[in-house]
Amino acid sequence: MDSFLRLLIHGASGRMGQSLLRLASEDPSFQVTAAVVGNAPHRHVSDGVPFFAAAELAAVPAFDVAIDFSLPQGFSSLLALCVARAVPLVSGTTGLDSRQHEALVMAGARIPLVWGSNFSVGMAVLVNLVERAGDALSGWDCDIVESHHVHKQDAPSGSALTLGEAVACKGIAPRYTSLRAGDIIGDHLVQFTGLGERIELVHRASNRDVFARGALSVARRVVGRVPGCYRVRDLM
């Protein structure tokens, strides 16, 4: 039995994909057997990693787990491949539509599956803190402000929506503000405001590696699990 996990990285040309490629290559518990990019003219090998165009996804070699940070239009094909091959999937692709989220739930009946808007340890802690604050601050206003780089398309961010769900389940309706500026990696502020006082909970990411490390950690832990839809914090 191999001492490493064979890893497929889907969305390897993106910012997160590049971080995953670099960190996985430095981690002896992984071997990248395929990197899938949307704009590759044909399959090729770079630094020992086989690259495949998105159109060639069905031809990728065997893998033990897939990590996906891509775009919604490429997500469904990867999900179908993982189900067909009975392989776990870890995905951080945001902006999915309702049908894709339904497909995620259905796939969770057949494979171990983790979808998360944010894979940092700090964000997992923030979600927990926000839930606890929601329990204690019924009747307070809640505002969620998220800031990202100018190239991020979806708004509010997936992480902001996750934070909003954490308070919405406590009966608090959050308001969202989205900022797109410069090269901000990701800032999230959750503000609870009452009469004469307010509480602010903040998470700031200064490096994408925190998300990539978290995704790799989750990928290690999801292999061998029974089928199901797991949360990031379930495996942190």
UniProtKB/Swiss-Prot annotation:
InterPro entries: DapB_C, DapB_N, DapB_N_CS, DHDPR_bac, NAD(P)-bd_dom_sf. Pfam families: DapB_C, DapB_N. One of its GO terms (molecular function) is 4-hydroxy-tetrahydrodipicolinate reductase. NAD(+) binds at G11, A12, S13, G14, R15, M16, G92, T93, T94, G116, S117, N118, F119. The keyword Phosphoprotein does not apply. CDD domains: DHDPR_N. Catalyzes the conversion of 4-hydroxy-tetrahydrodipicolinate (HTPA) to tetrahydrodipicolinate. Belongs to the DapB family. This is 4-hydroxy-tetrahydrodipicolinate reductase. It comes from Xylella fastidiosa (strain Temecula1 / ATCC 700964). The gene is dapB.
